[in-house]
Structure formats: C-alpha cells, structure tokens
UniProtKB/Swiss-Prot annotation:
Belongs to the lyase 1 family. Argininosuccinate lyase subfamily. Its EC number is 4.3.2.1. This is Argininosuccinate lyase. Coiled coil: none annotated. PROSITE patterns: FUMARATE_LYASES. It is found in: Cytoplasm. PANTHER family: ARGININOSUCCINATE LYASE. It catalyses: 2-(N(omega)-L-arginino)succinate = fumarate + L-arginine. CDD domains: Argininosuccinate_lyase. Pfam families: ASL_C2 (PF14698), Lyase_1 (PF00206). Keywords: Amino-acid biosynthesis, Arginine biosynthesis, Cytoplasm, Lyase.
C-alpha cells in the first residue's frame, strides 16, 4: 500500500520502488510503529478528532496485528515501501475504512523519528545491561587476581610492576564511562516528536503531552522543524557505540598479545578460539581479532550518518532514510561483540606464574630504586641519574638489579643499605603504591568495592 499517489498520473518504476523501499531495514521497528499508532489513535479519539468507535476499532485492529506479527501469522510484505505503510495497509485490510483514519494529524516524518526513538530507548536500556554483564566478569576476575603480579607497560615497554586485578579494573573504569555516556544519551533520545507533522505541526487539536505520557517519554520536543529533521540522537548513540568498541578493541589487542608464546600470560578457552586449515598446532584468538576488526565497522557506521546529515537543509529529506541501516548495524555489532567478549574473558585461563616472571624482567623495579634513594635524602634527579647508570651496568653484565651485591650497590652510591633488597622486591613495589587508584591490595580492594556498588546501582533485576 502506498500512502500517496493522487497527484501522480502513473505509478513509479519498479527500479524506483526497489530503490525507494526501506522495508528490509525498518521492519524490525514494527512493534514500535504499532505502539506509536496505538497512542496516536487513542489521542485522536480522546480529542474527538475521530469518533470513539473509530479509535476503538483502530486500537483493536492494531493489537490483533501486533499479536499476529509476534506469532508469525502475519509476515512482512517486502514489496511495501516501509514498515509504516505496511502496518497501515494491513490495518485497513482488516478493519476497512476506519484504518484510513489512523494517519490523521501525523506525517511519516514525525512517525519515523518516533519509531526510531522508541526503538533506541529499548536498545540503550538493554545495551547498558550487556555492559553490566561484562563488568561483573571483570569484577570476578579482578577478585581472583588481586595478588597476581604482572608488568605494567608504557610505549609497549615494561615499566613498573602492577597486578592483573589493577589492569582489569582499568578497563572496568572505561566501561563505567561508556554506560554513563549511554545514560546521558538516553536523555536526548527520550523526547517525543509525534505531532510535529511533516514540518509545521497540525491544524487538529492534538495532545502531544498525552501521547508522550502514553509512550513513556519524559517530555515532548519543542520545535517541529527540528523534530522531524533531527538525527543527533542517532549520531550520539553511534558515537557512544564507537567508544565502547574502541575500549573492546584496546582490550582485544592485549588479549591477542597475551596469548602469544612470547607473552604467554593467558590461554583462551577452546570454545572461544579457532584453528588453522593447514597448520595443526594453531590456536587462534579469532574472537579478539574480530572485535578489533569490527571496531572499524562501527566507526564507519558513525561516519556514514555524519556524512548523510552534513548537508541537509531543514526539514526532512529522503537522505535521512539511510540513518537506520548504519544505526542498526552499529547496535547489532556492539551487542554481539560485548556478549562474545564477555564469554571469552570469563572462560580464559590466567597464567599467574608467567605474569610474575614477566614482571621480574625489564627492570620494572628501577623507579623503586630511585624512590629508595630519594627517601634516603637524595634529590630525585640525582637518584634518577644513579639508577640509570645501574641499569646500564646490569644490561652490560646481564643481571637484574636485585642480583647486585651490596658492594656493587655502594659503588654507585654509599646511600644504599641492606634494606634496598626489600624495597625493590616486586611485592613491595606493588604494595607500597597505596595511593588512591594504585595497584596495592589496599587500593585495589577500594576499586573493587566501587565497582561492586556501580554494578548494584545499575543492574536491572
């Protein structure tokens, strides 16, 4: 069913029909389209814009269509122009002339953005729980690895000893911010545009606030031109999705490195690994690699919508039909990535001994030698110079700092005493960093408690 045609002398070319159709993309919004139509029909009846009988017949017809579509009795007609025309056409088929009254006082321009906002409200709410599920896994792994010492890196060079719990909690912080951004984005999605019409509202005495209440929106949009041409909320959602994928990608890169024989810090479960068609020994971290690769796909979705919107004058233009494919692809990709990544992290084996061995290489306790000298009264810059010389000598002699004799230490500075060996033990290096945010057991437990509280505050039961 076409929702237009009286002004035309002939039908559109079949190629144009195919080119113009969006039913394959927007059909996933059939529930939202019907929900919006139910609220609109109720308002039309309450405002005496259509008769009570017409409103009731439309309502019962829409509810029956929703039930039958949910049960698969009614299938989407892929020759329809879009989900809006399909639902209205199906309604008219079932209830006759009353169905033709549904579109009174609205346009597809405000209808489509209503559907999209309704869909996004549900999608964002669900996505936040996927993030919470990942946070729960990170919390579990962090609790198991409070005492697992590993090397921390800068510039991909070993820097200072930390713990695996500390490292995992760094990603937990990133995902906390992601959830916060989604919550903030939700506020701008949660505005009801129906009643804006094609661009200039309506001459009918419609009640936009009533529709907003029926549909669970916190408020109505304030400018009809902006309402039908606004896709900021979709772009903002894709921006949030892109940042989630960026964080997953960074984590994936480390997972991939840690799986190598060169690192051997973790082993992924067989259920989250793949093999090679030619090399029998291979166990590949394909999940992490795909997450890393799919990040570019979500970035592309964001750029698609930014590019679609960059040159559009007010108000609605058909270009905006391209918004949903990019948005839905981004949502689907992030949801699947989060769920799969969550399972990968939950089932991975941590090789604690290898992590500790790794922390013992690369002079990760060098900063602690300098701090030791400073605490003994030496200016930091002088201490830095002395320790640099110690490291250079150790490299030459192929030994670690803690392997130096007291005589060798004193050759670099008479400040050194026997307590240097305790000061540069890896466990001491970690546990002395008790500052808020640090890797010590005391600090990490505070971070774990904060994460527990965050999960409790945001998890839906």
């Amino acid at each position: 069913m076409k929702l237009w045609g009286g002004r035309f002398k002939k039908g559109t070319d079949k190629l144009v029909n195919d080119f113009n159709s969006s039913i394959n993309v927007d059909s996933r919004m059939y529930k939202e389209d019907i929900e919006g139509s139910l609220a609109h029909a109720s308002m039309l009846g309450n405002q005496n814009i259509i008769s009570k009988e017409a409103s009731d017949r439309i309502t019962s017809g829409l509810l029956e269509i929703l039930k039958r579509m949910d049960n698969g009795v009614i299938e989407i007609d892929e020759t329809s122009e879009d989900i809006h025309s399909f639902v209205e056409g199906t309604l008219t088929y079932y209830i006759g002339e009353y169905g033709k009254m549904l579109h009174t006082g609205r346009s597809r321009n405000d209808q489509v953005t209503l559907d999209l906002r309704l869909y996004l409200k549900k999608a964002i709410t669900s996505l936040k729980q996927d993030i919470i599920a990942l946070e729960e896994v990170l919390l579990e792994k962090a609790n198991e690895n409070i005492g697992t010492i590993m090397p921390g890196y800068t510039h991909m060079q070993k820097a200072q000893p930390i713990t695996f719990a500390h490292h995992l909690l760094a990603y937990a912080e990133m995902f906390k911010r992601d959830l916060g951004r989604l919550s903030d984005c939700y506020k701008r999605v949660d505005e009801m545009p129906l009643g804006s019409g094609a661009l200039a509202t309506s001459t009918y005495p419609i009640d936009r606030e009533a529709v907003a209440r029926d549909l669970g929106f916190s408020k109505v949009t304030l400018n009809s031109l902006d309402s039908v041409s606004d896709r900021d909320y979709a772009i903002e959602t894709l921006s949030c999705l892109s940042m989630i994928m960026m964080h997953l990608s960074r984590f994936s890169e480390e997972i991939i490195l840690w799986c190598t024989n060169e690192f051997s810090f973790i082993e992924l479960d067989d259920g989250y690994s793949t093999g090679s068609s030619i090399m029998p020994q291979k166990k590949n971290p394909d999940v992490a690699e795909l997450v890393r690769g799919k990040t570019g796909r979500v970035y592309g979705d964001l750029m698609t919508l930014l590019t679609v919107m960059k040159g559009i004058p007010l108000a609605y233009n058909k270009d905006m039909q391209e918004d949903k494919e990019a948005l839905f692809d981004g949502l689907d990709t992030v949801v699947l990535s989060l769920k799969t990544f969550c399972g990968m992290i939950k089932t991975m084996k941590v090789k604690k001994e290898n992590m500790r061995k790794g922390a013992g290489l690369g002079f990760t306790n060098a900063t602690d030698v300098a701090d030791y000298l400073v605490k003994k009264g030496m200016p930091f810059r002088n201490a830095h110079e002395v320790v640099g010389e110690i490291v250079l000598q150790c490299i030459k002699d192929n030994k670690m700092i803690e392997e130096l004799t007291m005589e060798e230490f004193k050759n670099f500075s008479p400040t050194f005493e026997e307590d240097i060996y305790h000061a540069i033990d890896l466990l001491t290096c970690v546990e002395e960093r008790k500052v808020i945010g640090g890797p010590s057991t005391e600090s990490v437990k505070i971070q774990i408690e904060a994460l527990k509280n965050f999960i409790a505050e945001n998890k839906e039961v």
